[in-house]
């Protein structure tokens, strides 16, 4: 997609090349202590071996104390936005609310560290209890470990909405930065209206991996579309870059009935987004990432199955939270060794997920399912219940 801003479009690779020139990847500079130098040196040796990036192991100090499956549940931090869309009669306003919910999950990444790569068969469940008495349930499962791929489904039957995806994270190493991409589609459904909104995830750039301070930026272009209503949004996430971009986000909302965009949106690096109607020229506040977020509820450890993320990574998480990185690293190695040993016992046998079903696109006319290689085994049942009660 072409650049929708008025600013020059500088490729991220060019910015990283400049960053490498500035830092020279010197792990012996004053920005690293002795222990960090040792850890960074070990990581560089892995990189020099030319093995696939997903098989490399980042130093434990770069780990966020939770699994990627749990991190994906952050998409539900502003669920109140999604829960009201079914009752919005105007297609225009309904599309804007779906757009707002999507942006709420990506507009500002506050944690620069990397979550654990889930082991195959790992699961994570949580729920949100809302003021209207309804409950949103979330379930995720690791479908594959090498290469990694994860599926999740978030649904609220009382309010008639479903959000699901199958994602395959990939990473590239650019000198002092990591570029994290997620192949796959995010699908938002309103079954009672037979509407599906489909979009891809942006890229997350982690800077300062080897030297300097860790920081994250959301970058990349994508399109949010609703085939039934015809609405679409061209979305461009912009990092600050070398030229200190004014906007973190630029969006154009379009419809076939109009030759020009109906709305334009601009995001700032403080987490606020404004919207301008091209018809009236009026600009208003659209979203603020600093508003209250909804915290999910997770069952106590003793109630969880052994393949739940909180159980699998229990000892790693505990030691990271207690700043015991050496022991955390040892416990992480134990988890990974167990994973390798189990893989050997399954050699030649395909892994069959417990909660998600693989889609045969040749025989399946359901577009929402076709956009995800794996979908939640109860998805069709949930749709039927929503159609029945809404």
Swiss-Prot record:
A cellular component term from Gene Ontology for this protein is: membrane
From the UniProt record, which GO molecular function terms apply? sterol binding
Highest taxon listed in the record's lineage: Eukaryota
Q: Name one Pfam family in it.
A: Oxysterol_BP
Signal peptide limits? none
What family is this protein classified in? Belongs to the OSBP family.
UniProt protein name: Oxysterol-binding protein 10
Biological source species: Dictyostelium discoideum
